Amino acid sequence: MSGFYHKHFLKLLDFTPAELNSLLQLAAKLKADKKSGKEEAKLTGKNIALIFEKDSTRTRCSFEVAAYDQGARVTYLGPSGSQIGHKESIKDTARVLGRMYDGIQYRGYGQEIVETLAEYAGVPVWNGLTNEFHPTQLLADLLTMQEHLPGKAFNEMTLVYAGDARNNMGNSMLEAAALTGLDLRLVAPQACWPEAALVTECRALAQQNGGNITLTEDVAKGVEGADFIYTDVWVSMGEAKEKWAERIALLRDYQVNSKMMQLTGNPEVKFLHCLPAFHDDQTTLGKKMAEEFGLHGGMEVTDEVFESAASIVFDQAENRMHTIKAVMVATLSK
């Protein structure tokens, strides 16, 4: 794909609005081609390394299925399957894998790790998730939003993110809003707002593209008129138990529930979540949350909203694969 060949995909602000739109158009085409049985393999003979320092269901499956659909082969290197950063430096790992593979995906910790891989690998490197950014997720989100509001441009859409906005999702949403001109509202306690420098940079770019970025603690004001309400988990299994109580107390008022959906005043508002979601007590962590904190029926989102007609989370999950495929095709095929 012109302009993308051999480029890295590390964070959204590395691209222009036009380039982001091109990736979304390619993803939509690849999705349509797959469903119609007309998909053409562009990556036959390519070898792809998937480095996972953090486990994942959606990211791994998306990369593997996308690669297989396009004729490529993959090697999965899980948390215990490589020496990256332990017995071998990131720099050396990059130079070794770059000699063997045509592309490298990294999902793990600091953004500096994926940046170092990109600097030394000599082949395209894709960010499957770092502590700071989650760009492939936002590609899927944007495609999903386009599909559900086909008559609107991004700068005519309002996206609300409710909850802990200081994480990789909050940062990547800021970057997405900067490039698309979304009306993005981060509805969260001030302690959970992203770094001010990134907010300032992205707000200026968003305004140039016809949008705006708002940070507020006021739920009613923040969600008014929203087209989409998005949230993410409040706690992770690896976090200390003491953190759970602190985080839940901080975020309890920002749970996505039927009241919040009604406060939008938009009967067509849709619910988004990058998954996994703790919307019931059918998981180990969900059960612990229910027992410890009385969070029966959901944590960051209620089961009622998650299972409602407004929920489009599984469209999002499917679109992870189509958008990741677009990134690989764009960067590995001429």
Swiss-Prot record:
Sorted alphabetically, the keyword list is:
Amino-acid biosynthesis, Arginine biosynthesis, Cytoplasm, Transferase
| Binding of carbamoyl phosphate, residues | 56-59, 83, 107, 134-137, 274-275, 320
Look up the record and name the pathway of this protein.
Answer: Amino-acid biosynthesis; L-arginine biosynthesis; L-arginine from L-ornithine and carbamoyl phosphate: step 1/3
GO biological-process terms attached to the record: arginine biosynthetic process via ornithine; citrulline biosynthetic process; L-arginine biosynthetic process
GO MF, one annotated term? amino acid binding
Broad class of the protein's primary localization: cytoplasm
| InterPro entries associated with the record | Asp/Orn_carbamoyltranf_P-bd (IPR006132), Asp/Orn_carbamoylTrfase (IPR006130), Asp/Orn_carbamoylTrfase_sf (IPR036901), Asp_carbamoyltransf_Asp/Orn-bd (IPR006131), Orn/put_carbamltrans (IPR002292), OTCase_ArgI (IPR024904)
Positions contributing to L-ornithine binding = 168, 232, 236-237
Q: List the disulfide bonds.
A: none
The record's catalysed reaction(s) read: carbamoyl phosphate + L-ornithine = L-citrulline + phosphate + H(+)
Q: What is its EC number?
A: 2.1.3.3
What is one cellular component GO term in this UniProt entry? cytoplasm
Question: By its UniProt entry, which PANTHER family does this protein fall under?
Answer: ORNITHINE CARBAMOYLTRANSFERASE SUBUNIT F-RELATED (PTHR45753:SF4), ORNITHINE CARBAMOYLTRANSFERASE, MITOCHONDRIAL (PTHR45753)
Assigned protein family = Belongs to the aspartate/ornithine carbamoyltransferase superfamily. OTCase family.
Protein name in the entry: Ornithine carbamoyltransferase
